[in-house]
Design a protein with these regions (language model features):
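OB-fold and OB-like single-stranded nucleic-acid-recognition modules
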Residues: 2-138
Length: 138
C-alpha cells in the first residue's frame, strides 16, 4: 500500500513538472527585432560565408538578427501566404530568402536594392531569414 502511494505521488510530481515546463515554453516572450542588435551584412557575403564553412557561419549568424543588403531577384508568397523576398547573390542557383512578417505597403520591384532585417534560420541551398521587416528601399 505504501509503495502504491509513493508511485502515485511520483507520477503526480512528474505531471506537475511537465505542466510547468510546457507552460513556460508556450508563454515565453517573443524576441523582437526592434530590441535586437543587428549584424549588417550583404547578401553575397552572407551566402559566401555559408558556402565556405556552414559550421562557422552558423556560429556567427544562426538565430541572430541580421540586416541584409541586396537586390531583389524574386517576389513570391510561401505556403502560408506570407510575402517572401529573395535577394540576388553572385551564385545564380542560391540566394537569401526573406520571409516577411507583413506585406510591404510600397510596391517592391525586381532589381530594386533593399535592406531587410530578420533572424537567420540557417542554410538549405539558400540562406533563410525569418520574421523579416523591410528597413529601407533604395
Amino acid at each position: 500500500m505504501a509503495r502504491k502511494n509513493i508511485i502515485i505521488t511520483l507520477l503526480v510530481l512528474i505531471l506537475l513538472a511537465l505542466s510547468i515546463g510546457a507552460w513556460y515554453i508556450f508563454n515565453k516572450p517573443h524576441r523582437s527585432l526592434e530590441q535586437a542588435e543587428l549584424i549588417s551584412v550583404s547578401a553575397d557575403s552572407l551566402l559566401a560565408s555559408y558556402m565556405q564553412n556552414e559550421k562557422i557561419a552558423n556560429a556567427k549568424y544562426f538565430d541572430k538578427a541580421l540586416a541584409v543588403n541586396g537586390e531583389i531577384s524574386e517576389l513570391t508568397t510561401n505556403q502560408s501566404g506570407q510575402s517572401v523576398i529573395i535577394l540576388k547573390t553572385q551564385d545564380p542557383m542560391a540566394g537569401v530568402v526573406c520571409t516577411l512578417q507583413e506585406i510591404p505597403e510600397t510596391g517592391l520591384k525586381i532589381g530594386q536594392q533593399v535592406q531587410v532585417k530578420g533572424f537567420c534560420s540557417g542554410y538549405i541551398s539558400d540562406v533563410v531569414l525569418r520574421d523579416c521587416q523591410l528597413i529601407k528601399e533604395k
